[in-house]
Amino acid sequence: MTYETDTTLMLVAVGEALVGILGNAFIALVNFMGWMKNRKIASIDLILSSVAMSRICLQCIILLDCIILVQYPDTYNRGKEMRTVDFFWTLTNHLSVWFATCLSIFYLFKIANFFHPLFLWIKWRIDKLILRTLLACVIISLCFSLPVTENLSDDFRRCVKTKERINSTLRCKVNKAGHASVKVNLNLVMLFPFSVSLVSFLLLILSLWRHTRQIQLSVTGYKDPSTTAHVKAMKAVISFLALFVVYCLAFLIATSSYFMPESELAVIWGELIALIYPSSHSFILILGSSKLKQASVRVLCRVKTMLKGKKY
């Protein structure tokens, strides 16, 4: 790639990462301040903070990988030195997805209304189960991340750089099957939390449909609090699903780069697209939470006042 292309893509990556880190840091900071003030933290705030922190780490790792690929290609080609980056990318990737899945599950049990004994048992205990569930997500992510990182051979990154592939064509061809196997396993693992979130979304739709059949809306179109809660939860879950699909496609591009003519460019484009998911979803979560939305309005008002004061 040319110097101009490298510079442009790097600026875009840095801009995306900074916007996402700012949004996720805001979520974590607001919830942390509320925790310090009240000496306790609500389950929803704990989940949102976990999602935000995992995505801050994920965005930093993606940005670091992108910078090393462009600015330090020799370091990028050394699989042993980059194995740490691979591990933390895989770990934060799984944590981010699993924590977001926990958010979908929490919305389902808090808002939906079903009368199955198991559903009611979990619904009554969901607040007590959240911390255990988040810890289980950490353990699951670690269990998947360690084997995957070990299975990534040292030749993988050499296949990304075109100049290295010229001298290592045979080696790359030999290892393509192994790389493809790791890639397929990575994407299959991500399919399970996606399916759980999808089922949660479908059950929320079913619950909303049953709820609207039991109530009568007024002439003005007023919706009761339960209906509003259903709609808000569905918006949050569907936005996660849509952005997660985009992220998986980007992840597929990045991990399949060794099959493509311009491997380095494919990796960078994959990482740029991947940054959209954690960056965009943070602002959707802020707008979907009354607490975070009010805090953001207060911050914007203060910034606006400060800017006006500087003008005069």
UniProtKB/Swiss-Prot annotation:
Topology of the protein relative to the lipid bilayer: Multi-pass membrane protein
PROSITE patterns noted in UniProt: G_PROTEIN_RECEP_F1_2 (PS50262)
Ranges facing Cytoplasmic side: 31-49, 123-128, 209-235, 288-312
Entry GO CC: membrane
Extracellular topological intervals: 1-9, 71-101, 150-187, 257-266
Swiss-Prot/TrEMBL keywords: G-protein coupled receptor, Glycoprotein, Membrane, Receptor, Sensory transduction, Taste, Transducer, Transmembrane, Transmembrane helix
Molecular function as annotated in GO: bitter taste receptor activity; G protein-coupled receptor activity
Compartmental location: Membrane
InterPro entries the record matches: GPCR_Rhodpsn_7TM, TAS2R
Transmembrane portions of the chain: 10-30, 50-70, 102-122, 129-149, 188-208, 236-256, 267-287
Further remark: Several bitter taste receptors are expressed in a single taste receptor cell.
PANTHER family reported for this sequence: TASTE RECEPTOR TYPE 2, TASTE RECEPTOR TYPE 2 MEMBER 7
Protein name: Taste receptor type 2 member 7
Organism name: Mus musculus
Origin organism lineage: Eukaryota, Metazoa, Chordata, Craniata, Vertebrata
Gene designation: Tas2r7
